[in-house]
Amino acid sequence: MSQTEEKKGIGRRVQAFGSFLSSMIMPNIGAFIAWGFIAAIFIDNGWLPNKDLATLAGPMITYLIPLLIAFSGGRLIYDLRGGIIAATATMGVIVALPDTPMLLGAMIMGPLVGWLMKKTDQLIQPRTPQGFEMLFNNFSAGILGFIMTIAGFKILAPLMKFIMHILSVAVEALVHAHLLPLVSILVEPAKIVFLNNAINHGVFTPLGADQAAKAGQSILYTIESNPGPGLGILLAYMIFGKGTAKTTSYGAGIIHFLGGIHEIYFPYVLMRPLLFIAVILGGMTGVATYQATGFGFKSPASPGSFIVYCLNAPRGEFLHMLLGVFLAALVSFVVAALIMKFTREPKQDLEAATAQMENTKGKKSSVASKLVSSDKNVNTEENASGNVSETSSSDDDPEALLDNYNTEDVDAHNYNNINHVIFACDAGMGSSAMGASMLRNKFKKAGINDITVTNTAINQLPKDAQLVITQKKLTDRAIKQTPNAIHISVDNFLNSPRYEELLNNLKKDDQA
């Protein structure tokens, strides 16, 4: 394996880890928001103080949210059974440290117990006497839950207390030294290579929850989610950009600023690498502004939309919120404008920049691909048949795997029995939902009413999936998850010629 391939492999593993963390946190964002509303509205200094209703906030962040995260983590590993025992075992960590929201402990305990439950069943079920299945299943789960609850209380809880103390001290040191804005030097570039999931959901969310529980709000929720820096970049392209980049920047600005899907501005930065300076300085400005004004959110601002920022802003601090977003956008815009005005026009176009971002991330961007409408198709496979060694090596070679499944030749498949199409992306939320909505509209206009179109995360694809649509760099993961499905790769998730080809094939099969 070459050094370049090894680096790509490491990068993909890191991104997959970030995706897994995101899959535990993102489905529970609604619970975070509900808790945030209760805390913001009913506490003593809230919008509508109510002592009785305010008592809901404590148990929700102490018990409900960690248990939901643990359940999600266990379920990702071993379905419902893994989730239930994971949530049970996490009570040990929660009860041992009742004054600290155990989000980080839940993120560890959930997948761990789910994996142990899976291995326990694999060991016990083949050896279970006939007629004793229910007894063995229930008691094996109960005994594992009992053991891991005690282990959580006695072993993991002290470890979590130490880790949370170290992280909290580090954050407090940065805050007191007025150095927290420097975190943007790492966070803003990390967003471009899709490490923001690991940073935001793995570090900022649990630490922010701890701070919010103690102080009522946390600045950590604003570090990665501020839409200002990205807006500044897109505004600069609206005014100083040329060609495709300029014309697409308007729609991208709406999707980014109001929709909260930040990845749509990443290709614009990659077109001119000097623009990394603009997003870093914009991010630092936003953090510095919020630090100076003492601003913070009570719950995660997810997605990082201006609308979410407005809804989450604490009472009496709406102007502080606006100031942080405005100044971040202003600094990012000014720096980007200077760079675009006084540096050479890049040879790289928007499509190439999108491809570079996707290659750097090790996956296709499901929303950024709206920016380009390329009709590129790979060359027809010259050698359709391969030997056994080539097939076995395809697991390590994504391109070979895609060739084996004819993922870019829509006409190569039989669609007679298709009644469900799934859009799959990394997190399974915003971008895949947009793609699914677009295809549903196409089906409706074409009179195809008997095919369901849904969206999900790659690692939650059902084993009986029939037709899966993914971005090209994600397709190899989707194939490994659902090897019996038809897989279609697209270069442009929201604007691909393959959708028309799919519609034509579905109509033909329907008429036949």
Curated annotation (Swiss-Prot):
The active site is at C425 (phosphocysteine intermediate). It is found in: Cell membrane. The modification Phosphocysteine is found at C425. Pfam families: PTS_EIIC, PTS_IIB. Keywords: Cell membrane, Kinase, Membrane, Phosphoprotein, Phosphotransferase system, Sugar transport, Transferase, Transmembrane, Transmembrane helix, Transport. Residues 1-28, 76-139, 192-278, 341-512 are cytoplasmic. This is PTS system mannitol-specific EIICB component. It comes from Staphylococcus aureus (strain COL).
